[in-house]
Amino acid sequence: ALDKIFTYAKEYGKSKGLDIKCYVPTHSLINYTSWQIVSPEASLASLDCVDGYIAQVWTGTAREPNFYNGVQKERVFENAFLEYGCMKSMTAPLNRKMYFLTDPIEDRAKDWLDYKINYQATFAAQLMYPMVDTYEVMPWPDRIYQGLYRIAGTDQKERIPRSYSTQMQTMVNTLNDIRTSDKKITGTQGIGVLMANSLMFQRFPNHNGYDDPQFSSFYGQTLPLLKRGIPVELVHMENTPFKETFKGLHILVMSYSNMKPMKPEYHNYLADWVKKGGVLIYCGEDIDPYQTVLEWWNTDGNEYKAPSEHLFEKMNLSRNPGEGTYRYGKGTVIVMREDPKHFVLKAGNDQKYFETIASAYQKKQGIEIETKNSFIVERGPYTIAAVMDESVSKEPLTLSGLYIDLFDKDLPVLTSKQIQPGEQGYLYDLNKVSGKIKAKVLCGASRIYDEKVSKQSYSFVAKSPINTTNVSRVLLPCKPEKIRVNGKEEQPEWDESSKTLLLSFENDPAGVNVSIEW
């Protein structure tokens, strides 16, 4: 249906001299699988009429509870990180455009503080991917600004608090300046986990007592890495025909305990990658009931008891190799005979899995895997950081420098920022401001128009939704002598260390005129 609709839209646009772009808004494969929904999203990527995707990741999807270390709970940042990564990797080999979505609220009835905390987590997670710089920032704005939601700790409902709308608008405005870059997130690169569309087909119903609580076979492969500060990559099996899929990948973890290969050809690409030097780690007992469904590996003359037997045979192994390490060409195959769900369902049961990966990485790359409890990425003047709980350390992360705190509505200037486990930080690095800039609104809760800079003055028009408060940090060459907001003189709140002026006034969608003289 989408093929017909998008093709018609493009042809109609062409007849009118318009180049119409068509994007598919979709949840991630992770979320659809978790929520037991089947979607054709990956197959749509190959349609010529599809220009890209809108990755619908927000608090509502990212807060789906999962298991780690035997504990089931919400892990919003970690889940969002994996969801955005899943969407990014789905389109990367095809070079399709990707928009990342965040939502300051969600459909479930929670309170404003809950929305704020989880918005920060998903917002930070999306910025961890420097190859994406296009965003959908506010689905259904009327719901955000006019909806009534609970005040934390009470049964009372109110519209969005001024403090939250100010912070949210400041965060959204920064995305106008975010650009793609070659900068990488901190942590050991090149470790991936294989996914496939068939993940969605194994979620329901349970058979013969075999189950996969909260999609634990997937999280068993990913969370033991992510929680140790490794930015695990997700690799889509449907993309293995593209060489770009394996670029920079050193180790690939896979399991057929919760998915199956829909085509035997995928094994050719996996085996070829191993033969050229890749390390493939297979985790699984191959005992789930879906191993015996009538499929290509056990029909039309094929007599494999499990699809993994076909893969192992491709790599000159026996059909059912025991646990151990095997060579194939220049590469390595490591077999672990345990379904990965057990790595997270049982407390402390992921150590052997992690040590297997760490040892394989050290042997292949000649260096140790870096373990830590945080991720940091720098994008221009913006520093994004996340510190995880349930990790290798309970220590906070301390960043030193000269920063504006973008997760604080008052935009304070800091020389040190401490981020606790389970929290995230978003900072404007003032030391990265170009010396060529004389005067500029660095950040704030309104959009800036009609900027005019002269030798001794700076003026602009600020626009933002009604019934919200603007707070802005304005870079100036020196302390101002006169400030006017809509003609009314204001007293300066000046920070000498950063050479910035703090401005605050009532927003107006028609525009607020600001003039500054020094």
Question: Model regions: which residues?
Answer:
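Hydrophobic targeting/anchoring helices
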Residues: 22-218, 319-322, 334-338, 343-347, ...
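A short, well-structured beta->alpha microelement
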Residues: 222-245
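A conserved amphipathic helix/loop scaffold
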Residues: 260-457, 461, 472-473
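Solvent-exposed beta-strand/loop surfaces of large extracellular or lumenal domains
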Residues: 400-417, 484-504
